Amino acid sequence: MRSFKFNLGQPVAITASGEVGVVVGRAEYINSSNSYFVRYAAKDGRATEAWWSEDALEAAN
């Protein structure tokens, strides 16, 4: 079992877009990477929530 890279409530950035949000949920799987449910403001201003794989996120400054 892998440990989680990000904590609940931790600010994270979506690597591909630079959008920043907060981890509001986490999921672990046997055969794939950990996933995180992130609440963030999309670049067009919409409030958004989506699942992201661990490798698609980085810690926000």
What are these regions (language model features)?
Residues 2-7, 11-61:
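Basic/aromatic-rich interaction segments and small domains that mediate binding to polyanionic partners
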